[in-house]
């Protein structure tokens, strides 16, 4: 079982064994980093990073990760590239493949990422699209594994917008055998195709998917409570409408009481405190938000090394 030379576009494309292979390697790399032990697995390698959406955690974690692995990362914004001026994606893919050893892309269109991967001859990593956020979901469930010790039979409850984040969480929870309950307002449900894909995986793993519009019901006996912003990047114009629609879809102390006593609280950040999550919960003892943010580094390093190392 080898991920060498493959793309990382979606958790849906991974086997359960491949998910745990990434987790196991992330655990090893995290221990090495904490011990100050060098691990230059990508010495002499370069990652080209295409950003059409701004980011804090994605850019820093990939750049630092490549540096810790002995390689280098090249930041490419759409303002700096011909892809931002109308060059075909397939041309960009083939040109960059002659210069770099891997391509990471954070953009709007998932179809664009798939086209990039089709024409690139080096591994392509999806760092976020409007449809999926697989690197974040992998880091989230790795964090749950660290804190809970076992994933199968655990329950994750997601409260909020049916966006790219919950789409990837549906994929991974179904794969690893975690139950997932999703509470969203009417008209803000997760992508129907993603739900169908997750349902197929859930049948194989024995997990359960529940989608409803009642946050308290969704949170009952949850091992993990998860939320994200009400208006994702590109949806800022809908802020006022969404504030009204999502009123009540908030992780707060009332919701915390419905979940298990030892539930962990997650948010992929940035958080709008007082909207999708309260200040006291994100800063409280159940919150693992910053463990989760750190684990982006370790999980992404594992992905890069498994895809790009000789």
Report the location of each language-model feature.
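Short, structured coil segments at secondary-structure junctions
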Residues: 69, 99, 119-121, 176, ...
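Phosphate-coordination loops involved in phosphoryl transfer and adenosine-cofactor binding
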Residues: 42-47, 152-154, 262
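Positively charged, low-complexity intrinsically disordered leader regions
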Residues: 1-60, 64
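Phosphate/diphosphate ligand-binding glycine-rich loop within oxidoreductases
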Residues: 36-145, 273
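Adenosine-phosphate binding glycine-rich loop
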Residues: 262-263, 269-310
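Rossmann-like adenosine-cofactor binding region
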Residues: 200-279
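Glycine-rich phosphate/diphosphate-binding loop of Rossmann-like nucleotide-binding domains
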Residues: 52-64, 148-227
């Amino acid at each position: 079982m080898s991920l060498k030379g493959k793309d990382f576009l979606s958790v849906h494309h991974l086997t359960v064994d491949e998910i745990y292979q990434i987790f196991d390697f992330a655990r090893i790399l995290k221990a090495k980093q904490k011990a100050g032990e060098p691990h230059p697995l990508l010495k002499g390698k370069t990652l080209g990073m295409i950003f059409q959406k701004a980011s804090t955690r994605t850019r820093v974690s990939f750049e630092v990760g490549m540096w810790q692995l002995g390689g280098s990362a090249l930041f490419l914004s759409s303002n700096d590239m011909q892809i931002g001026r109308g060059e075909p994606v397939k041309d960009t893919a083939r040109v960059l493949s002659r210069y770099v050893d891997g391509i990471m892309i954070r953009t709007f269109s998932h179809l664009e990422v798939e086209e990039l991967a089709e024409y690139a001859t080096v591994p392509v990593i999806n760092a976020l699209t409007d449809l999926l956020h697989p690197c974040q979901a992998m880091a989230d469930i790795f964090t749950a594994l660290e804190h809970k010790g076992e994933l199968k039979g655990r329950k994750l409850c997601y409260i909020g917008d049916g966006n790219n984040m919950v789409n990837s969480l549906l994929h991974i929870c179904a794969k690893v055998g975690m139950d997932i309950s999703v509470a969203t307002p009417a008209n803000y449900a997760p992508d129907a195709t993603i739900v169908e894909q997750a349902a197929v995986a859930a049948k194989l793993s024995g997990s359960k998917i529940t989608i409803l519009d009642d946050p308290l019901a969704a949170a009952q006996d949850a091992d993990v409570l998860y939320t994200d912003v009400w208006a994702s990047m590109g949806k800022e114009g809908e802020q006022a409408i969404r504030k009204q629609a999502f009123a009540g879809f908030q992780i707060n102390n009332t919701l915390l009481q419905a979940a298990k006593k030892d539930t962990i609280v997650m948010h992929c950040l940035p958080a709008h405190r007082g909207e999708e999550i309260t200040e006291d919960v994100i800063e409280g003892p159940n919150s693992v938000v910053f463990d989760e943010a750190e684990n982006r580094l370790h999980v992404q390093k594992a992905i890069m090394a498994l895809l790009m190392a000789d």
